[in-house]
A protein has these predicted regions:
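Positively charged n-region of N-terminal signal peptides that target proteins for export
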Residues: 1-5, 110-111
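Sec-dependent N-terminal signal peptides
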Residues: 4-14
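Subset of outer-membrane beta-barrel
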Residues: 21-330
């Protein structure tokens, strides 16, 4: 009974908290398809390729958690189509969540000047989750010999229905943005919902459902001068009783001689971390690096070291850009 209880707690920690951990991209809006399906194809260009990688908790776990993501999307008139692959890996049991999804969005202006715009998006796919139970330790494997510890050569006596499950993915989102290029303020707001079908997710045969995860993100680009802008923004996530808020400010400064933007930003994730980011934006290429400084109760163990995150985006531009931008001015 104790062994089963320990394992149930372990699995549930990944099915709920682990899912929230999935969304712990500090540079959250650098990955548009991961944040909101309504952002699929909503950019000024012919196509977009994005990759992002994150590693965290190396200071407290010899097997750190890792997130890897790659996506591609393309606008086709008012439509946008895209695909995304993500992989999340965590813990001694090599828990792994691999997901493939496709998305589609429809964006349209709601005024004659094409300044106010809305978009709707959907996303669907499959997630495979695996775990290696043989790498876990159980209470009957504990021995007092040699100072005490777990001996995995001792049989655990446990049997499981399987170490791999596949669950469906169904997500949707909405977004509004003001796209006038000459404006001092370009606000945007979006809402998205993930796990809409609340799929059954368990290795133990129980009726454990993956709850819906909701996002709200809001902000505005503020053009201070012709060469300097800031973007104050916020993100709120809710999944059952679990919640997360992130408050951030991004900045960009244009270097005329180098013909590129210097990027910087600071994010505060409530009771968890402060994230500092730096980057460059040059022509079609955007690169960012972010680092988490842990400020939670775990900081005494982690000594403040949280996670390192890398983000790369390449946008292939059209030969004749539109005179009026139709993308969120991020």
């Amino acid at each position: 009974m104790i062994r089963n209880l320990i394992l149930i707690v372990f699995i549930l920690s990944f099915s709920i908290k682990g899912k929230a951990q999935d969304a712990h991209l500090s540079l959250y809006d650098a990955a548009p398809l991961f944040l909101n399906p309504a952002m699929t194809g909503v950019f000024e260009g012919n196509w977009r390729l994005h990759a992002q990688y994150r590693t965290q908790w190396k200071a407290v776990n010899f097997k750190p958690y890792t997130n890897a993501l790659i996506s591609f999307d393309k606008p086709v008139k008012k439509w946008g189509f895209g695909a995304q692959i993500t992989n999340f890996r965590a813990g001694i049991g090599n828990f792994n969540a691999f997901q493939g999804s496709v998305s589609a969005a429809y964006a349209t202006p709601i005024d004659k000047a094409k300044r106010h715009n809305i978009s709707f998006g959907i996303q669907a796919g499959l997630t495979q989750k695996t775990i290696e139970f043989g790498l876990l330790s159980y209470d009957n494997q504990y021995t007092t010999q040699n100072g005490g510890g777990f001996d995995q050569t001792i049989s655990s006596g446990e049997e499981f229905a399987g170490s791999s499950i596949i669950v469906p993915v169904a997500n949707a989102g909405f977004m509004y943005f003001y796209a006038r290029q000459q404006s001092r303020f370009n606000p945007f707001i979006g809402f998205s919902a993930f796990n809409l079908v609340t799929p059954k997710e368990t290795y133990l045969g129980a009726d454990n459902r993956l709850p819906i995860r909701y996002y709200a993100h809001v902000g505005s680009r503020i053009n201070i001068t012709e060469v300097f802008y800031i973007i104050p923004k916020a993100l709120v996530m809710q999944q059952l009783e679990f919640s997360e808020q992130a408050y951030a400010i991004d900045m960009g400064y244009f270097l005329k001689r180098a013909d590129l933007y210097l990027l910087g930003g600071v994010v505060y994730r409530n009771s968890d971390a402060v994230i500092v980011s730096l980057g460059l934006k040059m022509d079609e290429f955007i690169a960012k690096v972010g680092y988490d400084v842990n400020v939670s109760s775990l900081s005494t163990v982690s000594t403040g070291r949280g996670g390192l995150e890398l983000s790369f985006t390449y946008m292939g531009h059209k030969k004749k850009p539109r005179t009026e931008k139709i993308c969120p001015r991020l």
